[in-house]
Amino acid sequence: MKAEYTDVRQHIIDQGKAIITRKGFAGVGLNEILSAADVPKGSFYHYFKSKELFGEAMLEDYVTGYLAEMDVVLGQPGQNAAQSLMAYWASWTSESLDGSGCDCRCLVVKLSSEVADMSEPMRVALLDGTHRIIARLALAIARGRVDDSLPAVADPPQMAATLYQLWLGAAMLTKLRRDASALQMARQATLAMLQLPSGQ
């Protein structure tokens, strides 16, 4: 029985994103996306003029959803900024690994090196997404300086960019190692950089 959905464009994005998260962009053909979404080719091209433009829309959708999730984690009531930031980094460990220890979620990790030389629109979409993520982190760090949960360690945007790059690299190593050791090391480095106790 065909599943019911009202937004065909979003349905195609959701189905394609699920496959591409597992297989990468180049490893997924248009027919596989059409089959998963159970839509004809004409419907796809009504919304996306090419697979590349679909990829751009998919990444923009991913970033929008990711930022919404990020806002929830960083805005938990009853937590100071330091606690919220460490909860955010903890989510990387819990969500970056599936049962076999393989990255299964982050499209930034999955696609950055693949699409950077393949598609300028997709590269720009990912780059814009990382800028927006770093901006969210910078706001959280600045809030920590106001609520006294973080010391005045560095310029918030610079610290946010450094931490994000640290964790992104750790997530990429996690794919190679198939364990959480790189993420655990990133956590310890984050605590040191933010001058937080190890039990934070």
Segments (PLM) and residue ranges:
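Short amphipathic alpha-helical segments with heptad-repeat character
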Residues: 120-123, 127, 131
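Short, basic, alpha-helical segments at the C-terminal edge of helix-turn-helix-like DNA-binding modules
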Residues: 60-67
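C-terminal peripheral helix-coil segments that are non-catalytic and often amphipathic
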Residues: 2, 87-98, 131-147, 157, ...
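Helix-turn-helix
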Residues: 11, 15-53, 57-58
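Short alpha-helical elements of helix-turn-helix
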Residues: 10, 14, 106-109
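Hydrophobic alpha-helical connector segments
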Residues: 57, 71-104, 156-163
